[in-house]
């Protein structure tokens, strides 16, 4: 509707999904990796300047390996709905396993996280892929990022308790009574990371109101 179009085009990092009228294929067009209203706003120009040509595809560029990891980390840890969070962890694990053996990858990854202001999403990405997927991460990388998040013991325990519930697959064997609360807390956190309160509150109120209306109501 008109509100959603305005919301996407004014505040978001992407256009509304474009659907082919015959095939039904959906195309997402992004002009940034997080919303324009997010607390951390990595420079799209920095990402484009470091993009690399895709071999065998003239004129086609992809993000550099460090930026691929940071994009995946930023997307996952700015998320508000974690029902598919495990897929994000698997994606990060695959990227780190593929690029981790390359010369200077880890040094470049840390440097890029500073340039783009994404140290804390990278911290979370490395920590939880290590715990969940047994991803191999050099000690110096984890140590370099330790200061990007609150380090008090109780905060670390709380953060782990929440993320290690929310990031596991949505299955009875991986959930407990606290899992809905963990996902609920991250739902709120994700929205506050992406939008300041003076914009978030009216947006959520409007979406809640329209979500409660009967189907077919004008």
Label for each model-derived stretch:
Residues 1-218:
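Conserved NTP-donor binding/palm subdomain of two-metal-ion nucleotidyltransferases/polymerases, i.e.
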């Amino acid at each position: 509707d008109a509100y959603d179009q305005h919301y996407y085009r004014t505040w978001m990092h992407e256009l509304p999904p474009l659907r082919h009228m015959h095939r039904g294929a959906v195309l997402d067009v992004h002009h940034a990796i997080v919303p324009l209203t997010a607390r951390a706003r990595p420079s799209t120009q920095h990402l484009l300047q470091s993009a690399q040509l895709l071999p065998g595809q003239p004129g086609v560029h992809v993000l550099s390996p460090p930026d691929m990891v940071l994009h995946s980390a930023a997307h996952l840890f700015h998320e508000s709905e974690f029902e598919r969070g495990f897929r994000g962890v698997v994606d990060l694990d695959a990227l780190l396993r593929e690029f981790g053996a390359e010369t200077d990858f880890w040094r470049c990854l840390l440097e890029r996280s500073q340039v783009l202001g994404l140290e804390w999403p990278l911290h979370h990405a490395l920590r939880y892929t290590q715990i969940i997927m047994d991803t191999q991460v050099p000690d110096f990388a984890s140590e370099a990022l330790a200061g990007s998040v609150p380090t008090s013991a109780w905060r670390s325990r709380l953060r782990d308790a929440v993320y290690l519930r929310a990031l596991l697959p949505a299955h009875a064997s991986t959930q407990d009574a606290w899992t809905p609360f963990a996902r609920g807390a991250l739902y709120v956190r994700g929205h506050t990371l992406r939008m300041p309160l003076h914009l978030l509150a009216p947006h959520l109120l409007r979406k809640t109101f329209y979500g409660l209306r009967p189907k077919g109501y004008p």
